[in-house]
Amino acid sequence: MCEYLSAVYEDVVKRNPGEPEFHQAVLEVLESLEPVLERHPEYKERGIIPMLLEPERIIKFRVPWLDDEGKIQVNRGFRVQFNSAIGPYKGGLRFHPSVYEGIIKFLGFEQIFKNSLTGLPIGGGKGGSDFDPKGKSDGEIMRFCQSYMTELYKYIGKDEDVPAGDIGVGAREIGYLYGQYKRITGLYEGVLTGKGIPYGGSLGRKQATGWGLCYFTDAMLRDRGLSFEGRTVVISGSGNVAIYAAEKAMSLGAKVVAMSDSNGYIHDPEGIDLATVKEIKEGKRGRISEYIKTRKNAEYTEGCRGIWSIPCDIALPCATQNEIDGESARALVKNGVTAVAEGANMPSTPEAIEVFLSAGVLFAPAKAANAGGVATSALEMTQNSQRLSWTLDEVDQKLHTIMTNIYENASRAAKEYGNDGNLVIGANIAGFIKVADAMMAQGAV
């Protein structure tokens, strides 16, 4: 990394202490940009990169709510409105005890590039709370969501900031949040995405991130004369992303042999019975360990790291950040993995990514590979603004086109800037240039 970019990174660390996830995300992007600055010194001269690294706005607020015992609990709420150069802020809400400002900044920063790559007019943002929905009653979750939106509504709008779901925020939570927004403002508008179909949601939104991940991976494989057909796949997670990635991988001819949740993982050498997983996770909201009650040849193992020791051709990490470390990456390479595509946000550590790239493994970074969710959210915004509802086939065709275009643009940028085949660098460059050009055109102040 050149002296200028090193100095920029050191300043980020100094100004944002105790936020390792944000530092990691920034470093990955900055390490990609040296060849861009050599060709476009105007980005340096106009101070584009330091501006891009500073959020336009950070909103932090308390969220008091009443539990079932009648006691008041207090959580912290966040919304980071990172960059609106190419459109209104767009990014999900995460409810999880690990949430703090640094994680929301990392996610919002990644969202800038991911949203840029879709080719759609959406900027980058992210929000959430350290509230833990696990173990809470439906009433408690409703009251928390209503309190959260009572503060957040002041800062969002269909043309300003459009949140969506993320970890801990599914259709139920979006419904409660949207209901409170409508109750307060009296406006029926596309201010949230991931809504239920009866009140303005889009068909295909639930499936979009997982399906899009497989469309991107398929484009990457086909560019090398490969495909999903006959391949063995390991997928971490068992939420929407993992379940619908498994569904699409199977429809493309692959055999998924392992999935996980936060407690442990299942290994079914005969192939995962996805209907059973859906019933456990979507129907009962249970633990994945229940899978082995009906699938006698399957095994359940406590803890999640071991899932990457299972031999596979394709690995799709769809659980959480930094779940694949260097050791797990080396185990995958040793067992002959051909491709790794990130369904979760930043699930591979920098060491793991280096292991994959050094071994010649096809590697699809999250900001490109999991952009299907936000792309379909933008399609939901379009339908809301036009007062239309598209069929599932229409949404799916648009999603397939968007994900294929993202792959082609990232691949082209990598080649153009001297890193052919490196989609990490290609995605960062392609996403950056569009946003940087928009910022240049609009002026610094």
Question: At which residue positions do the language-model features occur?
Answer:
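General beta-strand structural signal in soluble alpha/beta enzymes
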Residues: 160-164, 187-192, 235, 258-261, ...
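Adenosine-phosphate binding glycine-rich loop
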Residues: 2-25, 220, 331-445
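Glycine-rich phosphate/diphosphate-binding loop of Rossmann-like nucleotide-binding domains
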Residues: 201-309
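N-terminal ligand-binding/catalytic initiation module
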Residues: 1-203, 434-443
